[in-house]
Amino acid sequence: MNSVTVSHAPYTITYHDDWEPVMSQLVEFYNEVASWLLRDETSPIPDKFFIQLKQPLRNKRVCVCGIDPYPKDGTGVPFESPNFTKKSIKEIASSISRLTGVIDYKGYNLNIIDGVIPWNYYLSCKLGETKSHAIYWDKISKLLLQHITKHVSVLYCLGKTDFSNIRAKLESPVTTIVGYHPAARDRQFEKDRSFEIINVLLELDNKVPINWAQGFIY
C-alpha cells in the first residue's frame, strides 16, 4: 500500500499501486473542494471517503456503481450495510438469491466477491441528503471512474436517471449496463436481469463469469 497526504481530513489517503496514475490529480482536486465538503457532517465520515482505493484493480472484471453513499451510516464501501437494514443491498441480495437459489443468508456484500469492485460515483453526501455533494465531487468522480473503466470489462450502473449520460463522461470503451436502482418503484429492479447479463457479456469477452453467491454472509 502507498499513501499520500491531503490538506484536509482525512489528511492521509492510503491506496493500492493500481491507483497510482490518478493520485496526483486526485490530491489536487480534493484540496480544491475539501473545505466546502467538510462544512457538513458527511456520510461516510471523511476517514472513510477513500477506503475503496485500497482495492486492487488489475483483478477486477466488473464495477457495480451506485450514485452516492447511503445518506446515513455510509461505511465507505458502496452498498455495504453491516446490520443488513438498507433497502438497496437487501434488494440486490434478493435478486442474487433468485438467481442462485441461495436463501439462508444474513447479509450480502459486493466487496467480497472475486472480480467485482463496488463503487459510488460521488464519494460522500451531506448527512441525510442524497446527491448533496455532487457539485464538489464531479471532477474527482469522472477521474476515478474513468480509471476504473480502464481495468474492468463491464460497468454496471444502478439508476437509469442518475446514469442516463454516463457513457458521455467516459473516454475508455467499456461495456456499460445502466439498470434500475434497487429502490426503484414498481419493483422494476426485481425484473431487471442485469446480474445474469453481466456474466453473458463476460463469457463473450472470454472472461470468467462472476460467482455472485460469494457475496452472501451467513
From Swiss-Prot:
Subunit and partners: Homodimer. Interacts with protein OPG148. Component of the Uracil-DNA glycosylase(UDG)-OPG148-polymerase complex; OPG148 and UDG form a heterodimeric processivity factor that associates with OPG71 to form the processive polymerase holoenzyme.
Reaction catalyzed: Hydrolyzes single-stranded DNA or mismatched double-stranded DNA and polynucleotides, releasing free uracil
Protein name per UniProt: Uracil-DNA glycosylase
Keyword line: DNA damage, DNA repair, DNA-binding, Hydrolase
Gene Ontology biological process terms from the UniProt entry: DNA repair; viral DNA genome replication
Enzyme Commission number(s) of this protein: 3.2.2.27
Listed GO MF terms: DNA binding; uracil DNA N-glycosylase activity
Gene3D superfamilies in alphabetical order: Uracil-DNA glycosylase-like domain
Residue positions of the active site: 68
Family to which this protein belongs: Belongs to the uracil-DNA glycosylase (UDG) superfamily. UNG family.
Function: Plays an essential role in viral replication as a component of the DNA polymerase processivity factor. Excises uracil residues from the DNA which can arise as a result of misincorporation of dUMP residues by DNA polymerase or due to deamination of cytosine.
Entries under InterPro entries matching the protein: Ura-DNA_Glyclase_AS (IPR018085), Uracil-DNA_glycosylase-like_sf (IPR036895)
Gene designation: OPG116
